[in-house]
């Protein structure tokens, strides 16, 4: 428990290994790989609590998270730490220290207003921006279309779960020699978003990767039609890399399970009020 609290209050990170050789690429647009236990067993524990929250009416979610949904300022904090003075999103600037893509649902918790759902058996969709592997779209590679000689490539990932995000990180670990994942204090600890910071580009591998992508998409520039789910590797990445990734993501999901459990206990408290011991513990933890 002390370690969970420490990660929430101080953040957590991991440096991923560099691979000189790209894995065999086979880009297919339109569908994500399905989840499996191989890519994170903790998710399946954590998703049970997410489903409990997903059943709650959104007006109640807003009430109980109003004071703990602080503005997400993790990207700004990364810019400050790395002394990044200029960034470009999707080619909007010709010169910058970093090229950036934010795939997260910034400062949002749920997708649409909704009443309560009777039971998990009646859940047909994930209405929360939490643990949704379908949120990872091919936009995660969009910065590479605009990458010239920037020092950093920075991605705000919408989720850490599923094969898709691990395959993506494995590719980035051949495109850049330094790839780090961070879950900052100033990110939302209600959601499984995180930041990837990549630097020291491997030009040879980047050229090979972009050649494959452009041949599949039949375009040398980014097209919005490519902003869809995708799969990119036929074969699973090696177990060593998966375990290194899970070393980081498991810390995040353990923290989220604790936070979500407190929130659910607060929302279902016998007091029928936001003034209860679970909510007080939650506020103390996150503020």
UniProtKB/Swiss-Prot annotation:
The family note in this entry says: Belongs to the chordopoxvirinae mRNA-capping enzyme regulatory subunit family.
Originating organism: Vaccinia virus (strain Ankara) (VACV)
**Pfam families referenced in this protein's UniProt entry, alphabetically:** Pox_mRNA-cap
List cellular component terms (GO).
Answer: virion component
Q: Name the predominant localization.
A: virion
Q: What Gene Ontology terms for biological process does this UniProt record contain?
A: DNA-templated transcription termination
Please give the InterPro entries that the UniProt record associates with this protein.
Poxvirus_mRNA-cap_ssu, Poxvirus_mRNA-cap_ssu_sf
Assembly and binders: Heterodimer of a catalytic and a regulatory subunit. Intrinsic methyltransferase activity of the catalytic subunit is weak and needs to be stimulated 30- to 50-fold by the regulatory subunit, which is itself catalytically inert.
Q: Which UniProt keywords apply?
A: mRNA capping, mRNA processing, Transcription, Transcription regulation, Transcription termination, Virion
Outline what the protein does: Regulatory subunit of the mRNA cap enzyme which stabilizes the catalytic subunit and enhances its methyltransferase activity through an allosteric mechanism. Heterodimeric mRNA capping enzyme catalyzes the linkage of a N7-methyl-guanosine moiety to the first transcribed nucleotide (cap 0 structure), whereas the polymerase associated VP39 is responsible for a second methylation at the 2'-O position of the ribose (cap 1 structure).
Q: Name one GO molecular function term.
A: mRNA 5'-cap (guanine-N7-)-methyltransferase activity
Mind telling me what this protein is named? mRNA-capping enzyme regulatory subunit
Could you tell me where this protein is found in the cell? Answer: Virion
- Cystine pairings recorded for this chain: none
């Amino acid at each position: 428990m002390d370690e969970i609290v420490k990660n929430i209050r101080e953040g957590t990170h991991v440096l991923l290994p560099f691979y000189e050789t790209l894995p065999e690429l086979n880009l297919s647009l339109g569908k994500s790989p399905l989840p499996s236990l191989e890519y994170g067993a903790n998710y399946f524990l954590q998703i049970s609590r997410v489903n409990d929250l997903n059943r709650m009416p959104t007006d109640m979610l807003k009430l109980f998270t109003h004071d703990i949904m602080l503005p997400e300022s993790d990207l700004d904090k990364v810019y400050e730490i790395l002394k990044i003075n200029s960034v470009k999103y999707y080619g909007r600037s010709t010169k910058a220290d970093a090229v950036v893509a934010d795939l997260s649902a910034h400062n949002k918790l749920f997708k649409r207003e909704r009443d309560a759902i009777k039971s998990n058996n009646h859940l047909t969709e994930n209405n929360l921006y939490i643990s949704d592997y379908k949120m990872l779209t091919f936009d995660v590679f969009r910065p590479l279309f605009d990458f010239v000689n920037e020092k950093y490539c920075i991605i705000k990932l919408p989720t850490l779960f599923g094969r898709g995000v691990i395959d993506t990180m494995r590719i980035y670990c051949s495109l850049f020699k330094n790839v780090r994942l961070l879950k900052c204090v100033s990110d939302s600890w209600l959601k499984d978003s995180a930041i990837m910071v990549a630097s020291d580009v491997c030009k040879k591998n980047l050229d090979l990767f972009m050649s494959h992508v452009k041949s599949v998409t039949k375009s040398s520039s980014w097209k919005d039609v490519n902003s869809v789910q995708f799969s990119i590797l036929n074969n699973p990445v090696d177990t060593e890399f998966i375990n290194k990734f899970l070393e980081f993501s498991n810390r995040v999901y353990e923290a989220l399970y604790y936070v979500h459990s407190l929130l659910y206990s607060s929302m279902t408290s016998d007091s029928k009020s936001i003034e209860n011991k679970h909510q007080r513990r939650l506020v103390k933890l996150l503020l």
